[in-house]
């Protein structure tokens, strides 16, 4: 059965799957089916933590809020254009259209605010699960061209160009209903953003997918900068663990990367919070730091096999050169300005997972494109949960002290 949509709930204790014939809800630890209905072609499903309330998109423009325990419909809403994403926490319901975002009070379903955005066909948006730090993040809208704008002579007649999503993130306080900051995260357009469970950190990736950055929220100070690799790749999913010590990232390379967030690795020293909302553009963010076009070794794709030869002469030479390089960078970096020293010390993944090759079974989607995946980390054990577009659910164990390659411990399909 084809999967239309798959997502974890806010604390990763449940997994929800939307299909062409209803939806299913599973517990993640242990993995077991919790609820199933075979009615309706469900395009999108979102849960509210572990409650019986779910938000469903039944047709392109129609939202239905359902109580699965009572098997009743709480309300239905119809929107002017296709609903591309739904986000919710205990205070707010967020509906994302291509060029609008609707904010609702989830208790009363009263419309609180409508945000006009630039075209956002990928529905890049993140809502904090926290009721206190109830922040919404989305790409900063582009300024509209002046009415007197004249297209260049070489432009085709009637040609209209829609600018791509910006690389800047707007932070919106959904309780105060006001924009509070803009984070200039990337030079390239955004591809993926996510907030941690406390609403105090945001991770960003651009459409090149080589650099992952983590900023504090709401002040927008850059705390970490990670290199996924040098080969451009589409980032499909990013997820913090509940303690915000690890960041898990999946992409079109079929390699899952885990980055460690520790105080010693922070690329920023302690900075005072701004006294008023402002555009956050630290020199470490864009102007003096390496960006997506920087070249470096990559552990993905064809180069991944090099990990398996660490006992060979080449492996020893590689480790030696890396050790010398890191030591040299640490010494030299101490004499350089902060923005320059970052170029010497790109932070790599702490651990990684290679997804097994598999053919989609009867429950897979049969797509021939890149294997898409959604990732989350277990609350109780050092494990990474991965759901793939071919209908598989994997659980990998991670060594939190040594890192390295994760071990597949469970698989369901």
Swiss-Prot record:
Q: How does it sit in the membrane?
A: Peripheral membrane protein
Region labeled Disordered — which residues? Answer: 263-315
Question: Key word Protein transport present in the record?
Answer: yes
Query: PANTHER family recorded for this chain?
Result: WD-REPEAT PROTEIN INTERACTING WITH PHOSPHOINOSIDES WIPI -RELATED (PTHR11227)
Quaternary structure (record): Component of the PI(3,5)P2 regulatory complex.
Report the principal subcellular site: membrane
Query: What are the alphabetically sorted keywords of the record?
Result: Autophagy, Endosome, Membrane, Protein transport, Repeat, Transport, Vacuole, WD repeat
The family line of this record is: Belongs to the WD repeat PROPPIN family.
Please give the superkingdom of this protein's source.
Answer: Eukaryota
Give start-end positions of Low complexity composition bias: 263-289
Q: Which SUPFAM superfamilies match?
A: WD40 repeat-like
Domain description from the entry? The N-terminus might form a beta-propeller domain involved in specific binding to phosphatidylinositol 3,5-bisphosphate (PIP2), leading to the association of the protein to the membrane. The L/FRRG motif is essential for the cytoplasm to vacuole transport (Cvt) pathway, for the recruitment of atg8 and atg16 to the PAS in nutrient-rich medium, and for its recruitment to and dissociation from the PAS under starvation conditions.
Where do we find the motif L/FRRG motif here?
Answer: 226-230
* Transmembrane parts of this sequence: none
- Keyword Membrane part of the UniProt annotation: yes
One GO CC annotation: vacuolar membrane
Composition bias, Basic and acidic residues: 296-305
The molecule here is called Autophagy-related protein 18
**Biological process GO terms, please?**
autophagy; protein transport
Q: What does this protein do?
A: The PI(3,5)P2 regulatory complex regulates both the synthesis and turnover of phosphatidylinositol 3,5-bisphosphate (PtdIns(3,5)P2). Necessary for proper vacuole morphology. Plays an important role in osmotically-induced vacuole fragmentation. Required for cytoplasm to vacuole transport (Cvt) vesicle formation, pexophagy and starvation-induced autophagy. Involved in correct atg9 trafficking to the pre-autophagosomal structure. Might also be involved in premeiotic DNA replication.
- Indicate where this protein resides in the cell: Preautophagosomal structure membrane; Vacuole membrane; Endosome membrane
What phylogenetic lineage does the species belong to? Eukaryota, Fungi, Dikarya, Ascomycota, Pezizomycotina
WD repeat residue intervals:
1-36, 69-114, 141-182, 185-225, 230-269, 308-354, 366-406
Q: Which organism is it from?
A: Aspergillus oryzae (strain ATCC 42149 / RIB 40)
Q: Which InterPro entries match?
A: PROPPIN, WD40/YVTN_repeat-like_dom_sf, WD40_repeat_dom_sf, WD40_rpt
